């Protein structure tokens, strides 16, 4: 092989390696870096918490009939799932509070009690801003980490007393009060600040749970639902062809979301 051919071969191999490496680096960046998307619609409501100040994004409804807290995946608020869900729910008549799990985890250490305090504060701020009654119905929804944290809050006796149910999109079987680098890379949360949803499930009473299951999602878990107490209604909502992000909260997902809320309204909390 001539020198010129060797040079061409080396350069060709280098280009191939770069082409293969680029999507891997992009994927790692996508996992590790928080999303910096800022909604053009939401108003930020300040929260004063024992763990430090924070804020919830408020999406107004013309004639609000209840409150929906939308909790993010571990990457933070994005136009991928959270923003479409918040906008859809506001149009449907819910005063929405957006909860950025990544920002919360990046700015403090916390446990279940502090997480419950924070969710309660978000509900109270949205209730006040929307002018809703103290006994208005409340729902939590979340994607991945957000769904897991919603379960942790619901398992506490100190949660908001008017919680109707949880709309959980793609939770895993374990989570953490926080977000570690290992979590972002897909490792199963372990250690003293982690928790299993199945361990919390027996404490969940008086609400309903709808879990959305993407057909192509390798990360979610449904086994934890079997640990719920007798009388805590739950249902699985299959989303055909959907990966972990539920297909970006498209029309099919949002339609199922609406039907899940109606199911909760039609279903007694204790059977």
Give names to the regions the model predicted:
Residues 2-24:
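N-terminal Sec-pathway targeting helices
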Residues 74, 214-218, 240-243:
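Acidic beta-to-alpha connecting loop that harbors the catalytic carboxylate
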Residues 109-132:
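Alpha/beta-hydrolase active-site loop
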Residues 129-131, 135-195:
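Primarily recognizes the serine-hydrolase "nucleophile elbow" in alpha/beta-hydrolase
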Residues 26-63:
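N-terminal cap/lid segment of alpha/beta-hydrolase-fold proteins
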Residues 176-230:
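The feature captures the conserved acid-bearing segment of alpha/beta-hydrolase catalytic domains
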Residues 232-271:
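C-terminal catalytic histidine-bearing segment of alpha/beta-hydrolase fold enzymes
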Residues 61-91, 98-101:
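Short, surface-exposed "cap/lid" segments of acyl-processing enzymes
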């Amino acid at each position: 092989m001539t020198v010129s051919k060797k040079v061409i071969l080396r350069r060709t191999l280098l280009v191939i390696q770069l082409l293969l490496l680029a999507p891997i680096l992009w994927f790692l960046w996508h996992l590790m870096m928080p999303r910096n998307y800022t909604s053009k619609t939401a108003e930020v409501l300040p929260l004063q918490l024992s763990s430090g100040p924070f804020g919830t994004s408020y999406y107004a409804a013309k004639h609000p009939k209840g409150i929906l807290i939308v909790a993010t995946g571990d990457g933070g608020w994005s136009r991928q799932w959270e923003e479409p869900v918040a906008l859809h729910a506001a149009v449907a008549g819910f005063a929405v509070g957006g909860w950025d799990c990544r920002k919360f985890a990046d700015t403090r250490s916390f446990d279940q009690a502090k997480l419950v305090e924070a969710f309660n504060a978000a509900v109270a701020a949205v209730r006040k801003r929307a002018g809703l009654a103290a006994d208005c119905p409340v729902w939590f929804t979340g994607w991945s980490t957000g769904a897991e944290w919603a379960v942790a809050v619901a398992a506490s006796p100190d949660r908001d007393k008017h919680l109707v149910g949880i709309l959980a999109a793609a939770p895993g079987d374990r989570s953490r009060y926080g977000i570690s680098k290992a979590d972002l890379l897909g490792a199963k949360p372990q250690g003293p600040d982690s928790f299993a949803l199945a361990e919390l499930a027996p404490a969940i009473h008086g609400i309903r749970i709808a879990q959305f299951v993407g057909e192509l999602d390798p990360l979610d878990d449904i086994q934890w639902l079997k640990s719920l107490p007798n009388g805590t209604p739950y249902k699985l909502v299959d989303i055909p062809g959907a990966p972990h992000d539920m297909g970006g909260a498209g029309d099919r997902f949002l339609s199922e979301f609406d039907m899940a809320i109606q199911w909760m309204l039609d279903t007694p909390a204790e059977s």
